[in-house]
Amino acid sequence: MTDQAQQKRILIMAGGTGGHVFPALAVAKYLSQQGWKVRWLGTADRMEARLVPQHGFDIDFLDIKGVRGNGLLRKLAAPFKILRSVMQARSVIQDFKPDVVMGMGGFASGPGGVAARLSGIPLVLHEQNAIPGMTNKLLSKVATEVLCAFPDTFTDVRAETVGNPIRKELIALGGNRDKACEEEALKVLVVGGSLGAKIFNDVMPGALEGVSKTHPMTVWHQVGRNNLASVKAEYQHLGQDGSVKVAEFIDDMEAAYRWADVVVCRSGALTVSELAAVGLPSLLVPYPHAVDDHQTKNAQVLVEAGAAFLLPQPLVDSSKLISKLSMLASDRKELCKMGERARDVAVLDATQRVAYACIKLAEKG
């Protein structure tokens, strides 16, 4: 550990969803191991309030909400709330005196990024999605360094493509995918986020029943809160309860990825990057209400590489999944090739590349 006088400091702004928080935590842990002091800026009512302290980092909160797509009164009040949040963020910056401020998405990134530039602190932005969010789109005009996970995300500013930081434990899984070619029963992991995905809960029981008529298949299905009993009952009604493991939430995604031969899931930025890193083929059903339909653009990275199939939600039913899963179950060599193609597009050193951008700016002083 460097002594206190020389210790570099970073203020990280990331919150709201796992797609923002988990990549930021990967960078925070890396920099902390390099002797950096890390502090976080977020909002008190989102997941970062719980997760960040659990990982050993101090966090400050801003009183800020999203303004996109909300009512007129909130939009009218937004400039005043944003100004107040900028002042709150500036107070944190003056107290902590970071060498670098990094924004990775979430409500706090906007006012925190503005406060950083007003304070003369270098600002690094990282955009996880293939289409930038509104905050990063605006801040990219004033940021010192702009990073993105996917090529051609920003069209009007210079940005470096560095991938999405993910946990090193998942990267280590990527070299062990040959089992998909050898095992008899196709192992299908179904995940729809912490709330589950209704479309998967509706169609997967019928899909398992249909595929099982010609090919052995087992399912690990994450159904989301308050859906466990109803989805379990549907599998049981179709006589498939012996071939499925149903859970509200999967805490150990490392174990789930290690178990799976193929994944049925949404195409959030972090999910797409994790699938690439672990070398898993997938059936991707983008969330149809995502802002700017960014999940469809995220999915294209794997689809164009031949590592995934894109299934628009309006076209998804049990018969569509039966067709795709039966095809994969009957052609294990192609299934393995899809996994290899996924691994080929992975950016395995994304955490280090994002961290290095921060280190480089700090060294410039």
UniProtKB/Swiss-Prot annotation:
UDP-N-acetyl-alpha-D-glucosamine binds at T17, G18, G19, N129, R167, S194, I250, A269, L270, T271, V272, S273, E274, Q295. GO terms for biological process: carbohydrate metabolic process; cell division; cell wall organization; lipid glycosylation; peptidoglycan biosynthetic process; regulation of cell shape. One of its GO terms (cellular component) is plasma membrane. Keywords: Cell cycle, Cell division, Cell inner membrane, Cell membrane, Cell shape, Cell wall biogenesis/degradation, Glycosyltransferase, Membrane, Peptidoglycan synthesis, Transferase. Its EC number is 2.4.1.227. It is found in: Cell inner membrane. It catalyses: di-trans,octa-cis-undecaprenyl diphospho-N-acetyl-alpha-D-muramoyl-L-alanyl-D-glutamyl-meso-2,6-diaminopimeloyl-D-alanyl-D-alanine + UDP-N-acetyl-alpha-D-glucosamine = di-trans,octa-cis-undecaprenyl diphospho-[N-acetyl-alpha-D-glucosaminyl-(1->4)]-N-acetyl-alpha-D-muramoyl-L-alanyl-D-glutamyl-meso-2,6-diaminopimeloyl-D-alanyl-D-alanine + UDP + H(+). It is a peripheral membrane protein. It comes from the Bacteria. Gene3D superfamilies: Glycogen Phosphorylase B. It is an enzyme of class 2 (transferase). Pathway: Cell wall biogenesis; peptidoglycan biosynthesis. Transmembrane segments: none annotated. One of its GO terms (molecular function) is undecaprenyldiphospho-muramoylpentapeptide beta-N-acetylglucosaminyltransferase activity. HAMAP family: MurG. Belongs to the glycosyltransferase 28 family. MurG subfamily. PANTHER family: GLYCOSYLTRANSFERASE (PTHR21015:SF22), UDP-N-ACETYLGLUCOSAMINE--N-ACETYLMURAMYL-(PENTAPEPTIDE) PYROPHOSPHORYL-UNDECAPRENOL N-ACETYLGLUCOSAMINE TRANSFERASE 1 (PTHR21015). Cell wall formation. Catalyzes the transfer of a GlcNAc subunit on undecaprenyl-pyrophosphoryl-MurNAc-pentapeptide (lipid intermediate I) to form undecaprenyl-pyrophosphoryl-MurNAc-(pentapeptide)GlcNAc (lipid intermediate II). This is UDP-N-acetylglucosamine--N-acetylmuramyl-(pentapeptide) pyrophosphoryl-undecaprenol N-acetylglucosamine transferase. The gene is murG.
